[in-house]
A protein has these predicted regions:
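Elongated, mostly alpha-helical coiled-coil "stalk/stator" tethers of large membrane protein machines
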Residues: 1-94
Length: 94
């Protein structure tokens, strides 16, 4: 079985995004269920989702979040950030 949040977390870690930008994205995606719902809702047009991403998130995360949105995976953002934290801890201990 594929661990989707972990896979996204690994990609995010490899992107080496500025911690402040990650914090912004984490806050938006974990504290706004309405935002997550809009980004996973199949009734919201893809172009609208992309506009939302470009208006709210740091540019360094646009493509990553667009892929998550296109795949309907934004709903796993909280688990992804938890997995990301685990990767960071693991790398710091090696």
């Amino acid at each position: 079985m594929i661990d989707l949040p972990l896979n996204y977390a690994r990609v995010l870690y490899d992107m080496n995004i500025d911690p402040e930008n990650l914090s912004t994205a984490r806050s938006l995606l974990t504290e706004s269920p309405e935002l997550v719902e809009a980004l996973v809702n199949p009734l919201v047009r893809r172009s609208e989702k992309r506009n939302i991403i470009e208006k709210l998130f740091p540019e360094s995360l646009w493509n990553f979040l667009k892929v998550m949105s296109d795949n309907g995976d934004v709903g796993c953002a909280s688990e992804m950030f938890d997995a990301y934290d685990g990767i960071v801890r693991e790398k710091e201990n090696t």
